[in-house]
A protein has these predicted regions:
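Glycine/proline-enriched, intrinsically flexible loops and inter-domain linkers
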Residues: 2-8, 16, 155, 160-162, ...
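Phosphate-backbone binding interfaces of nucleic-acid-interacting proteins
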Residues: 1-178, 207, 300, 325, ...
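Self-splicing inteins and homing endonuclease
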Residues: 173-197, 201, 369, 388-397, ...
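TRNA-recognition modules of translation machinery and tRNA-sensing kinases, especially anticodon-binding
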Residues: 213-241, 255-256, 262-389, 501-563
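Residues forming anionic-ligand binding surfaces in small-molecule and nucleic-acid pockets
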Residues: 112-134, 180-227, 333-353, 397-398, ...
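Extended, well-folded interaction surfaces typified by the phenylalanyl-tRNA synthetase beta subunit core
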Residues: 146, 397-560
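Terminal amphipathic helices with adjacent charged low-complexity linkers/tails
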Residues: 151-191, 377-404, 410-411
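Internal insertion modules embedded within essential enzymes
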Residues: 60-95, 306, 313-368, 387-394, ...
């Protein structure tokens, strides 16, 4: 920034007429053919001569399809724009433009920055992104930790689980000396468990006191959050989100000074409401699992958030928060999935909880978050966290090595099978006569039956190793599709060419569908086929028209946030 001349306006605003050196390649050319700094209008309050800033030039297109062009404004031709974080999609900060001296560069690195340097490279916006399609059973892969594990399986690269070292550093919660007081009392009072499964079997809470509310998120962390599709909000919130991305454990940060213990995890009562962090009001269902606290001694009377989905406005971390309570919990997958869909909140946390989170990860995640808050926010972590833990040990699976050949057709020796199961984290015992007792790791809730273990062996040996067997063709009779099958396929292909999508839905309807389409339920039932053992008790009839079940599909997709 060569100079910045303040110019008061009639409306009371003060704008700066600036001359900015953007390097000889991008500077303007005067009438004598000399390169001169660009003239740019800027209203940012932190604009000052001598600053090194990020400039977007004419022709650039910013997020929101905002095109940068030379334009006359405030009596000058502004030939570019000095950019803020929000304008570049780097965060929500729009209080001023980006000043590179505050952007994480060392003094030596800052001194080397020259006009004309590529800001995309300086801000690490030019690095490639890896997009991974993760199947619903691979909840652990929704993290750097999980992806690194899969990379190890794929390439043989050395893998060290970061949660192991973090867990060893976490404070001991068992056998505390008499009189030692934990951070806050936690009670789980689930009177309406879904399918008999209590909604929360582990709740780990740890306080960090003396946090500096003026501390900023380090730029490396902000970059990683943004590149993962998340917004940078504040250090405390960013730390919990980063731990989730890194380890796979969703977390929540509360303002400890606003929380009154005990914390009670319970189901919602009829008629309760909640305003979530995004400012939306929600009518709560009796199936919703809630995090509540106890103001004035009234146990569980104030709702703090929908467990595993989104927190409420009360208790959130603000710019004045000095003491933080970290929540690191394990919730029932079905409870979280239903609440997220019911309230149309497909949050990053709910996506992980509904797929299954490691039930032994909570202390390690809280330890990592505490270390980051100490390093960048000067906080002091508590040594007496609360750990409500009723997690049951995993049931061993009796597994015969011969199942691999029987189910997958792979001729794999016993030692290889044992090595593969051990490598994915299982505890393998036995092996005599080809029989194992296999205990799956805590991060793999999808491994429950012998066939699940066969799938893992086949996946890591390689599906391409499965022998190909061509089914024998019939000796007599017609070969291939019938004329009717060919006609149906041709029609489907033709409609698909016009952009239409085929919908396959269950053909079951009931009273609710008749009511939605103003049909006479009694009359319709008389001419409908009733199923003796329906999949859903409220839809026991076969449809006579496809429209009601198409409507069911649309409704289901909308509930899941699909437009």
């Amino acid at each position: 920034m060569i100079d910045a001349t303040p110019e008061p306006q009639k409306n009371g605003k003060i704008i700066n007429w600036c001359h900015v050196d953007v390097g000889d390649e991008y500077n303007e050319t005067d009438e004598n053919g000399n390169k001169v700094p660009r003239g740019i209008i800027c209203g940012a309050p932190n604009m000052a001569a001598g600053e090194k800033v990020v400039v977007t030039l004419p022709g650039a297109v910013l997020p929101g399809d905002f095109k940068i062009e030379p334009r006359k404004t405030y009596g000058h031709i502004s030939n570019g724009m000095c950019a803020s974080e929000r304008e570049l999609g780097l965060g929500d900060n729009h209080d001023g433009i980006i000043l590179l001296r505050k952007y994480g560069f060392t003094p030596e690195e800052y001194e080397k920055l020259q006009p004309g340097d590529d800001a995309m490279h300086l801000l690490h916006l030019d690095q490639p992104l890896l997009e991974i399609n993760i199947t619903p059973d691979r909840g652990y892969a929704f993290s750097y930790r999980g992806v690194a594990r899969e990379y190890h399986h794929s390439t043989g690269a050395v893998y060290t689980d970061p949660a192991t070292a973090l867990g060893k550093k976490a404070p001991v919660t068992q056998g505390l000396p008499e009189g030692a007081k934990s951070d806050i009392e936690v009670i789980v009072d689930d009177k309406n468990p879904i399918h008999g499964v209590v909604g929360c079997d582990r709740y780990y809470a740890r306080a960090v006191r003396g946090f500096d509310p003026a501390s900023h998120t380090p730029n490396w962390m902000r970059r990683r959050l943004i590149r993962a599709g998340m917004r940078s909000i504040s250090l405390a919130v960013d730390v919990t989100n980063y731990v989730m991305l890194d380890l796979g454990q969703p977390m929540h940060a509360y303002d400890l000074d606003k929380i009154e213990g005990p914390i009670v995890v319970r189901r919602a009562n009829e008629g309760e409401k909640l305003t979530t962090l995004d400012g939306k009001d929600h009518d709560l269902s009796v199936e919703d699992l809630l995090i509540t606290d106890s103001p004035n001694g009234e146990r569980g009377s104030r709702v703090l958030g929908i467990a595993g989905v989104m927190g409420g406005l009360y208790g959130e971390v603000t710019a004045e928060t000095k003491n933080i309570l970290l929540e690191s919990a394990h919730f029932d997958q079905v409870s979280i999935a239903r609440s997220a869909r019911r309230h149309k909140i497909p949050s990053e946390a709910s996506r992980r909880f509904e797929r299954g989170v490691d039930d032994q990860l909570q202390p390690a995640a809280a330890q990592m978050a505490a270390e980051l808050l100490v390093k960048y926010g000067n906080g002091e972590p508590s040594e007496h966290p609360t750990d409500y833990n009723t997690v049951c040990n995993r049931r061993p699976i009796l597994f015969k090595a011969s199942e691999v050949a029987r189910v997958a057709g792979l001729d794999t020796d016993v030692n290889t099978i044992s090595d593969i199961l051990t490598d994915i984290g299982c505890t393998v015992a036995g092996g005599g006569n080809g029989e194992f007792s296999v205990t799956p790791p805590s991060w793999r809730p999808d491994l429950n039956e012998p066939c699940d273990l066969v799938e893992e062996v086949a996946r890591l040996v390689g599906y391409d190793e499965i022998p190909v067997t061509v089914p024998p063709a019939p000796v007599e009779g017609r070969v291939g599709l019938t004329a009717e099958q060919l006609r149906k396929r041709q029609v489907a292909d033709e409609l698909a060419e016009y952009g239409m999508v085929e919908t396959l839905s269950y053909p079951f309807v009931g009273d609710e569908d008749y009511k939605n389409f103003a049909l006479d339920a009694d009359a319709t039932k008389k001419v409908s086929v009733e199923i003796a053992n329906p999949l859903a008790g409220d839809r026991p009839f076969l449809r006579r028209d496809i429209i009601p079940t198409l409507a069911q599909t649309v409704q289901r997709n909308l509930r899941r946030g699909v437009e």
